[in-house]
Amino acid sequence: VASTARMKIALIAHAPAGDTFWDTVRKGAEEAAAKDNVELLYTSDPEAGRQAQLIEQAVDQKVDGIAVTLATPDALKDALKKATDAGIPIVSFNAGEAASAQLGAFTHFGSNEQLAGEAVGSKLAEGGYKHPVCVIQAQGHVGLEARCAGVKAKVPGTEILYVNGADMTSVESTATAKLQASKDADVIIGLGAPITLTLLKSVTTAGSSAKVASFDLNKELAQKVVDGSVLFTVDQQPWLQGYGAVDALWQNKRGGFKVGGGQSVLTGPAIVDQSNAAEVLKFAEQGIR
């Protein structure tokens, strides 16, 4: 454990309840906090107004640093201005890379979502896929919109399907109806592991011949890539996002260091397919991939 004085860092995400992705982020953050002698205050709310309130609470608690996801940057800018006015250093992670610097963060940890989407689109184009359905589980989330835009840039026949990610039964029925109506859909893409695992059911129920591809990872999804039910996934390595964000704030307090040199620190995209999924599964079983 670092010999530096105890410090308090708030990590404030837009995580919905039950999404395993955020467990991995939190694991990374907690590991960095333990090493850096940091008291970690982890909170999250998928509703933008409530996430802004959590930021204001952290400012009132006089934390030493704030790590924040920027899925809805406009809704958070006033709260983050209060943090910068109070002299609290900020890093962003996971979502909102484009807005990060103007909202006062000194760096951003995450994957460039447009590039990640293009990586998926290129891989699908190589495989001969022409009619992907890209499923967005949270309308207006800048990162998810960028992923599908990236896919569409490489495969112009891509269609967007909006679903309510907070209700998996509704995700399954909406995707099933879409696949039944769109006989030419040849691949359906989930933008998160729990969504993709649900889309596998939709493909079966719809009697569709569409293949399934994904973004993000958990151990169930890694297993589906190993056994060939899912073509591949693109991992943004969320453990690194949580770890990097907390550690960067500690480094800033320790020596005024600003990791990233004013640029983002990229944690992805990392493609996981049958060639490397078994290796990744080992780490997914530990909850770090």
Language-model region placement:
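Short, low-complexity disordered leader/linker segments with a strong preference
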Residues: 1-8, 81-88, 289
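Hydrophobic alpha-helical segments within soluble ligand-binding/sensing domains
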Residues: 51, 107-132, 170-172, 218-221, ...
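Flexible loop/hinge segments that line or gate small-molecule binding clefts
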Residues: 74-115, 218-231, 281
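Extracytoplasmic "Venus flytrap"
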Residues: 7-32, 36, 41-53, 57, ...
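Hydrophobic alpha-helical
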Residues: 52, 68-84, 151, 165-223
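Short, solvent-exposed amphipathic alpha-helices that sit
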Residues: 20-36, 116-120, 142-158, 174, ...
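Hinge/cleft segment of the Venus flytrap/periplasmic-binding protein
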Residues: 154-155, 240-289
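Immediate post-signal peptide segment of exported/extracytoplasmic ligand-binding proteins
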Residues: 1-9, 34, 125-128
